[in-house]
């Protein structure tokens, strides 16, 4: 390999300064072409000419890496170019010229290289896209890995780096930039993989994957959403309804906002499922509907038991052949008439409440009705035996997720005067800036990045996790303790093996700080029934994480971790050593 400094290696020249932009903060930089690092590597019949530099962003302090690679044959003829950058993109494509025709010289130590310049210009340079994963959930390396595998399979890309996957919060000078970067995993078709926390306006799928240069914009029609994914840990062994039905409405609700996105149901079962066991009729029926709707199933073998419905009559026959619920329950039935199809199912919960609150049936009726439309039915769909009152529907003024689905699919409730104009929320998603989970998820991810591990997580608005024993066994925690009292659970339980510390963290907004202080007094049962029996003589700290406001110091002695609205982080001065270690060299105040 040959090494040079300057703007030319004798074959190619960067004839103009580089203009780049930090994708974390938007700061623009001009890079002097005279001070580039250059190297040449021979790969068989191809020569790779590397032009690169590193710099510190003037805006956020992040370390930026910029590189252009030019390929040539043995004669020095241009083949192609590409650009590989960390946390930075080109504002304008580099201007590359053939450097062999008009005499000129470049000093490389004591070695002088003769080269030339002509007017032949090699353009290139569409800035490389990034992958942006938007989610309401705590980003997990295993799920990111699965999603990237799915992306590569369906979008003709390939993984180029696959080491231990770690998720790093971007913290610069003590300020969290509200973005996470994936390390240890890279693909050929994207410069970087970033994660941002969002919330849905109503019925939101767990993950949205965009492929584009910059972060997606709320409400934009120009963004390139390529995948929408729902994740579930629930197996057919654990629940007859929840895994397949409860999430069904989400695949319908997204359609007015994004018509051409690929949809996925990801079974990420942490508990082992019994693959050889025949799934329940409910599981088969619901999964077949998802397949009919074009949803790709991942993490569950569909080759033996499942297939899409081929006709409306097949859908109706299958449902009619399923086992009926116990007496007193309203069965879900599908009945076809000449001018309508009636689908029965109770939406009220409790049965006499008159509301729309039965989540599994909301999902089931949404899925069934969407499937009926998919199979070609264009007449009325009427939901019967629903238990919903007119006064409840009038009170909602159409602002209800099932009424949104009714509007999307052209459904109506039997005996109910439906709202005249149901207006869907303007945004399908928005960046989260008002949830307590912003602080406790950041604390969770930062500590895991530095070697601590999660014993339990139940972040606000996220799927509830399992209790992890010291041997790695996963346990589903009950709703009650041994005395029949509600089992109070923290938002996250973190363990540091080196110091034998366990942190029980309750996440709250600044406005609900006092409630958090009171709630951590209720953790006796989880400590005595689960933590001490599994982890022995550990040191346990009960504490609160806070998001919101603009405090200049820790707002209460029980607050371990504070995240301000602008991203500024403050750590309690009495924080244990394991927390101090995790935030060392980030500029965070302690």
Residues covered by each model-derived region:
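Short metal-coordination and nucleic-acid-contact micro-motifs, chiefly zinc-binding Cys/His arrays
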Residues: 15-21, 49-53
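Domain-level recognition of nuclease-like catalytic cores that cleave nucleotide substrates
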Residues: 265-382, 536-590
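Short cysteine-rich clusters marking metal-coordination/redox-active sites
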Residues: 22-25, 57-60
